[in-house]
Design a protein with these regions (language model features):
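Conserved Nudix-box catalytic region and its N-terminal flanking loop in Nudix hydrolases
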Residues: 13-41, 53-55, 125-135, 158-171, ...
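A generic fold-level signal
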Residues: 2-4, 12, 61-63, 81, ...
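Residue-level signal for short segments within beta-strands and strand-turn junctions
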Residues: 11-13, 73, 146, 175-177, ...
Length: 327
């Protein structure tokens, strides 16, 4: 028998939760361990479903294997018992109280509907998250930031960061060209309908998260290449400013909390939109729009978008300073 086998169960009662964890006894099945653990907390009847398995790897330690369950229990008013001995907690409080990043990832996946999954999470010897995969597919990891923008020493999975609103870095690139009306056009991208937030909305020319271990400028160059097929160099991107912003909404029935510090870049090399190679999973289409017209639509309506005026103002200030320097 491996050194450690365990269960991790999310027990739900009317959108409140309890996290139950237990080590399996010799000769005990995962289902028996889960039932024993839930039963020890509350004798009320419950239903359950096996959802996945976690392989937990830490440097210089034996691997751990944890069976993942989701269970449901009726609220006290829906059953004969007058008392409820389990401490029920809302989703946000659960995330704050979970000690390990692997538990946060498990909780995030167990909240979602889907087939049985295999999750593997690896930590380095400093106990910092190094990698996470689900069914063999890598999950995106972020470096979490302090309020001043410095690293917090925490690496977090993308879905968890967007569930609890952790501050993380992103790179935004605005592609511009000169025109004869307001002075500049902006290239807008229309987000893919498959995006986990703001699907089908017009957005920044190119934008993306800064992966764990990466920095703003390399991330910006990578996003330009991946989303639009533009192979740029560091000298082609001009830093217009930094922006901190928080956005919260519900998409596909799930809360989405995006708290980010963004490096805002301007790219002014010639771009033929007809020759761009769009990443279908990210970008549905692109279009040029006059800068002032874009500002009017963002401020007063007229297009479905997820663009913010304060970021357009950052770009505008940069372009005005550049114009002054060129005169």
């Amino acid at each position: 028998m491996p050194e450690k086998l365990g269960v991790f169960c999310v027990l739900e009662q009317k959108e409140k939760y309890q996290i139950l964890k237990e080590i399996m006894k010799e000769g005990e099945s995962p289902e028996e361990c889960m039932a024993r653990t839930v039963g020890s907390e509350d004798s009320a009847p419950f239903s359950w479903k096996a959802r996945g398995i976690l392989t937990l790897v830490r440097e210089d330690k034996p691997a751990e294997y944890v069976f993942l369950f989701r269970a449901w229990q009726p609220a006290p008013e829906d059953r004969k018992e007058e008392t409820d001995t389990v401490c029920w907690t809302k989703c946000d409080e659960i995330l704050q109280n979970l000690a390990g990043e692997e538990e946060k990832i498990c909780f995030r996946f167990l909240l979602e509907k889907g087939p049985f999954f295999s999750l593997k999470v690896t930590f380095d010897r400093r106990n910092i998250l190094r990698s996470a995969t689900v069914n063999g597919k890598p999950l995106e990891l972020f470096d979490i930031l302090k309020e001043d923008g410095s690293p917090a020493g925490i690496v977090r999975e993308r879905g968890v960061a967007h569930l609890d609103g952790s501050l993380h870095p992103t790179s935004h690139i605005w592609i511009v060209r000169k025109n004869h009306s307001s002075g500049w056009d902006l290239l807008l991208q229309k987000r893919s309908l498959s995006k986990d937030s703001n699907p089908g909305c017009y957005d920044i020319s190119s934008a993306g998260h800064v992966s764990a271990g990466d920095t703003y400028l390399p991330a910006a160059l990578r996003e330009l290449g991946e989303e639009l097929g533009i192979r740029a160099e560091e000298k082609d991107l001009h830093l217009a400013g930094m922006r901190k912003a928080y956005f919260e909404d519900v998409f596909y029935g799930k809360p989405f909390r995006d708290y980010e510090i963004s490096a805002v870049y301007v790219y002014d090399k010639p771009v033929d939109e007809e020759k761009l190679v769009l990443q279908e999973s990210e970008v549905e289409a692109v279009k040029w729009m006059d800068f002032q017209e874009c500002c009017r639509r963002v401020e007063h309506g007229g297009m479905k978008h997820c663009i913010y005026m304060d970021e357009l103002e950052i770009v505008e200030r940069y372009l005005e300073k550049r114009k002054d320097r060129e005169q």
